[in-house]
């Protein structure tokens, strides 16, 4: 039962990380964009 109580309190504990969680899914898109820009810079060899 203590574990369930701990699990219930987690969202409050991680409230400060909400902006970070919003940004995390975008990171792979930034890598894709970076790869495209890099290939454009080297001339798509």
Swiss-Prot record:
Primary location class: membrane
Stored Pfam families: PsbK
Topology of this chain in the membrane: Single-pass membrane protein
Positions of transmembrane segments: 24-44
Swiss-Prot/TrEMBL keywords: Membrane, Photosynthesis, Photosystem II, Reaction center, Thylakoid, Transmembrane, Transmembrane helix
GO cellular component: photosystem II reaction center; plasma membrane-derived thylakoid membrane
Function: One of the components of the core complex of photosystem II (PSII). PSII is a light-driven water:plastoquinone oxidoreductase that uses light energy to abstract electrons from H(2)O, generating O(2) and a proton gradient subsequently used for ATP formation. It consists of a core antenna complex that captures photons, and an electron transfer chain that converts photonic excitation into a charge separation.
Family the UniProt entry places it in: Belongs to the PsbK family.
Name this polypeptide is given: Photosystem II reaction center protein K
Species assigned in the record: Gloeothece citriformis (strain PCC 7424)
């Amino acid at each position: 039962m203590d574990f369930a109580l701990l699990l219930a309190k987690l969202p409050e504990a991680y409230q400060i990380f909400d902006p970070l969680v919003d940004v995390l899914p975008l990171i792979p898109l930034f890598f894709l964009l970076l790869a495209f820009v890099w290939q454009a810079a080297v001339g798509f060899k």
